[in-house]
Amino acid sequence: MNNFPACFSALILTITIACPVAVSQEQKPVDIGSRRELFVDQFLIEKLDKAWLQQGTPRDEGIALKFDKPWEGLFCGYVTIIQDGAVIRAYYRGSPKAGADGNSNESYCCAESKDGKIWTKPELTGFDHEGVKTNRVLANAAPITHNFCPFIDKKPGVPASERYKAIGGTMTSGLIALKSADGLKWEKIRSEPIISKAMVPFPYMFDSQNVPFWSEAENKYLCYFRVFKDGIRRIVRSESDDFINWTKPVLMEYTSGNNKSPIEHLYTNQTSPYFRAPHHYVAISARFMPNRRVLNDEQAKAIKVDPGYFKDTSDAIMMSTRPVEGKAHASIYDRTFLEGFVRGGVGAQNWVSRTNYPALNIIQTGPAEMSFYVNQDYAQPTSHLRRYSLRLDGLGSLHANYQGGEMTSKPFIFNGNALSINFSTSAAGGVLFELQDTTGKAIPGFELKDCQEQIGNEIDRIVTWKKGADLGMLAGKPIKLRVSLHDADLYSFKFHKP
């Protein structure tokens, strides 16, 4: 566990030191409109001086859902969380026995919640177990039930009968498409796969949770799915206008700031639009470390893990991608943070194969809180889904310590008349803002010295200067944003009309 590759240390150093990012003065300003910008990458950053991007720290909120029904069991996995109005649903594979991918023991189950914290299992008709109603939405549908992955189709004009869509399948079957009006009763869109083995130029594929969704930012369907390249579990991206006809998949590459990122086994990708900033696709992914054994035979026996599932280990990492910024960005995951996002917890049960796998999607669970979920204790009698929370937008932040630091953005154009920030300071800390022209010269009236220091902890605060908060006269004009902060974090910002 202590053999940390030297190359990782070198890459992480490039993130934590002040590292100016060069930009040409002729570069076309980015039009950010009134969208919210997160601090999970360096896309908008021109220069950092004694400030850095810092990964958020999820809080363990405990067990959300136990996989304790006879048709669920040790090998439950590939979880998707969907919020549909007042109802939140968790879809997950039920699999009480180990077996080949797509075996007949696999089904798909559903749990429901009103707040994302307390979950119940509905009694549904259609897939009884020994005469008892179950919470299964799919059964006797192998191999779809190996990795069924649903979403709400938000494409304008979609028929009510197809409001929900999903895919599932293995390399043998290809990815089969399904539809549903209510997310509970499903049928195939067609018998043939929408993405077949023949379409994918890699030797192995689909052995994972393969993620489809409608992108409001790109106005198309996307599918991020797993392949093997050079023996490594990798991710590819495919596009579609109609959910039936898909483009040749493109291999996703990884960067970390201005550097290439290590290529690691990513078992699941869990890429989805962030709900408060859908041009940011966030991927809380399962990082798999094959043959990196932690437990000895005695420890494995004590936790009753299946003997075939304790000789590797895994954790969760966080990536992001911005394909809306152009083709050059579409095939790149930004791994600004190479460190684990969710580490294995205390106890042998957290250090087995295929545990700590994140569920798909992040949801809001409080006025200032959002949650995601992680599949834990895999292949053990205690198999369950665990909830982790963060502050809204708290995946990453612009951070400076007590001594202080600064960030200067690249040129951008905004729409709106006020700057809203999500931030936190200590009692001694603070944040100041300055608006500049594209040469870096402060715009009169919006200089750092004229800004009211922002002190406190708020999700949405309007920044003011001595002359007020109105920025309408600068809307549509290229500007830069300078941020000076000490003992503080800035989680996001946006320009809008309050």
Label every model-predicted segment.
Residues 20-24:
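Sec/Tat signal peptide C-region and signal peptidase I cleavage site
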Residues 1-11:
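Bacterial N-terminal signal peptides that target proteins for export
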Residues 25-498:
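Carbohydrate-active catalytic/glycan-binding domains of CAZyme proteins
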